[in-house]
From Swiss-Prot:
Species this chain originates from: Anaeromyxobacter sp. (strain Fw109-5)
EC number annotated for this UniProt entry: 2.1.1.177
Role description: Specifically methylates the pseudouridine at position 1915 (m3Psi1915) in 23S rRNA.
Recorded name of the encoding gene: rlmH
Record field: catalytic activity: pseudouridine(1915) in 23S rRNA + S-adenosyl-L-methionine = N(3)-methylpseudouridine(1915) in 23S rRNA + S-adenosyl-L-homocysteine + H(+)
EC supergroup of this enzyme: transferase
Residues engaged in binding S-adenosyl-L-methionine: 71, 102, 121-126
CDD domains: RlmH-like (cd18081)
Subunit structure and binding partners: Homodimer.
Pfam families: SPOUT_MTase
Gene Ontology cellular component list: cytoplasm
Protein name listed in UniProt: Ribosomal RNA large subunit methyltransferase H
One MF annotation (Gene Ontology) recorded for this entry: rRNA (pseudouridine-N3-)-methyltransferase activity
Amino acid sequence: MRLRVVAVGRDRSGLYAPAIEEYAKRLGRYVKFELVEVPEARKHAGTAQARDEEAEALLAKLGPRERVIALDERGAEWTSVAFAERVRRWTEGGRDVALVIGGSDGLSRAVLDRAEETLALSRMTLAHRLARLVLVEQLYRAMTILRGEPYHK
């Protein structure tokens, strides 16, 4: 079973990269974790065209039987404990899970339709790289909650 974050864009600034790498390393103690990045659409593309280009790249990275969770501002919000329970349910039976983060124009209808659930990290808009960090930290927190470890207090 793999747990993956599939996201549009790369952290060019390097601002969040060290923290993301640290939480990814910690997650590796509990589950096979992978961060997959696809390129952002060309800037000259219109919003719909950009979303479609990014959708094509995102969908190509998803396995046919992989459980897909899309991050979307209209998605469900959970507490960390409720999120941990959701992660437990998603990973039951050894099925691969991919949490998908779109680009600055969001996710296309095709990606949202492929998703089994949608998740909102916050009702506030987060920078995409910050959302990636928050998600990876919450995945790590979920693993520690599920194992009764003291990280989550």
